[in-house]
Amino acid sequence: MDFLHHILSTYASFFDWKMWGEVLTDPVSWGLIGSLVVLEGLLSADNALVLAVMVKHLPEKQRKKALTYGLFGAYIFRFIFIGLGMLLIKFWWIKVLGALYLAWLVIKHFWIGEKEEEADGMKKNSWMVRTFGIFWATVISVELMDLAFSVDSILAAFAVSEKVWVLLIGGMLGILMMRTVAKVFLVLIDKIPELENTAFVLIGIIALKMAGSAFHYEMPHSVFFIIIIAAFAVTLIIHYINKQKQVREQTAASKEE
């Protein structure tokens, strides 16, 4: 009963308007919230990349809808997980499932291959697509990944503060940032096709990182960010080389005509 009472008290504090008044007028509170938003933003770069790839197969308008609908689910998961607090540490299996799903996307892209009309990780003959349709099946997949990402984000947030109001405001702003970054990645992938392969390489690294954290091995954030920056730098160089090659081929073809 004490355990249940503790959880209910935590959720009840979300609606303590006096507390919110004190929080929103306290500069120290905003300092903590700002720190958490920055942390969430840095951690959300890889999450946003995964979400961008997951919705890439949809028409442009449906991509935005899928990310928007997934946004509501992400807020719900974040609200629930903040209430549960440190009990998240017991949900290691969510990270394992998320890592396995990401690993499958990488294997399918590089080794198994897929038909052009089949989505990245979302086959048209899969049971989810047959049951819910391609759009809603994609939304469900996004929600499942949000579930795994919520575990990572909340555990990281507890390192900044264990105060409910810091976790709630910082976490909600972090989710919004993740969706914004995901939309930017979608635009970049359309303009620089080589980024798609880079995305799957990084998704493989993310899968290893997520699986490792489930068994208490944490890749240093500095190492992970260096890998991301290096991957994007190499991709831009390859894109430039391919562009120059394409220009030379077009020039040669026009001369032959």
Curated annotation (Swiss-Prot):
Pfam families: TerC
Subcellular location: Cell membrane
Superkingdom, taxonomy of origin: Bacteria
Topology in the lipid bilayer: Multi-pass membrane protein
Keywords, comma-separated and alphabetical: Cell membrane, Membrane, Transmembrane, Transmembrane helix
Any single GO CC term annotated in Swiss-Prot or TrEMBL for this entry: plasma membrane
Spans through the membrane: 23-43, 79-99, 131-151, 158-178, 199-219, 221-241
Entry similarity comment: Belongs to the TerC family.
PANTHER family with a match to the protein in the record: MEMBRANE BOUND PREDICTED REDOX MODULATOR (PTHR30238), TERC-LIKE PROTEIN (PTHR30238:SF6)
UniProt protein name: Uncharacterized membrane protein YceF
